[in-house]
């Protein structure tokens, strides 16, 4: 069975005939093929003694592409029906369910994780070789060159009916409580564990499992310097000991975590001299007003119960009206709201990052973890995790994997296909989906080239500008093609044909009367995609 090669003669035209919808999903499938993910998934889901009509790895990759388009159920695989002339017949809903049921088994989950790691190594190599380079994180105006940042967080997924594993959640909801780990640099979902709704927020075994799986997804050449950030809900003695044990002679693992304030912490804060409080720092490196930071490492009495090598940073801010209801007696007395960050960043700071030893830098570094709510959780819910489609636990585990793969494909498409456009490269799929995923295009067979050219990286960069131009063009703009000599009149490229009215961008199209005397808007050609004859 041919899993890829469907795009060996892919072209973009502007004649507006034979249109298909969701043509931008071609970029996602191209990313899966060029990184080797489709083939790796095929091997991971292959079973001895079976020969399904549709390869299960290809079905899972197709379902991930449909999830990126907004699929919320297994029957939404029909979103890919428009692309049948290019990708072939889309799988049916029952076929998708069987593939997800297979992918949700513990053995298949391990094999899929290894397959994703192999494809991710290829993708990160291509990203690093792009003109923009690998996206290193910048904090307080300082670039963490060479550091891979992993953010861990849990979220609630509501279940609107009885499903296997659903349980009452701590926020008085009902559903599931998955725990995930995201790469802040690329915004990929490295690992995620589906858990019942009543799962704890600071369960060490779950955090250890997800973190180990996430580190296994990081390519070995990028694993030498890793920074892990966890919020206060996930902090525990066991987790901090585990984070400290990750460092070795060959790799450095730093972390920051939130801290549940107790009376001992308030006693340490009371001992801070007034002149020790320094203004905090924003993400751009400028100073904050009425938001101060100070270190309490030597003042904290309960530090004896924790491992050596830790530092504690206190932060105080003026409480809002909403926060004023939950203040402690000491906070009400002082008029400040306090929070504490725990870290193992040494007194000398991070090597190669000037000023990283200051409490202000550590404070802003940990506060940047809040971005996981938008760049991680919101993106995940925009791509399939707003709800789980099945009543069975195993199928829902397979759906979570498909949603994670969809987030990976969207990230690779941004970083490889849009690497030369900072706005599109950093777009948030939750609020600004990739352009070109919905506009109709055309699929038409063409003769394959005699000697196909092999690109050193994703060849989809050739069609991205055309797709983006079509997606961003105003409604009233007349489209022309510089590659189509038929769009010329009188030797002038792009001239308007006889009987047509030229349209300027931003103005409504002209109206014409039909034979019945009614006005109808003249249809305009739309950009299109062509595929091979044997697609």
Model-assigned labels for residue ranges:
Residues 31, 77, 359-393, 398, ...:
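Short amphipathic alpha-helical "interface-anchor" segments enriched in bulky aromatics
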Residues 31, 62-63, 74-77, 91-92, ...:
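Short, conserved catalytic/metal-binding motifs centered on acidic residues
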Residues 1-10, 252-374, 381, 468-481, ...:
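An anionic, glycine-rich sequence signature occurring as long contiguous blocks
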Residues 201-264:
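Domain-level cores of phosphate- or acyl-group-handling catalytic modules
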Residues 83, 245, 261, 271-278, ...:
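Short, well-ordered loop/turn and helix-capping segments at boundaries between secondary-structure elements
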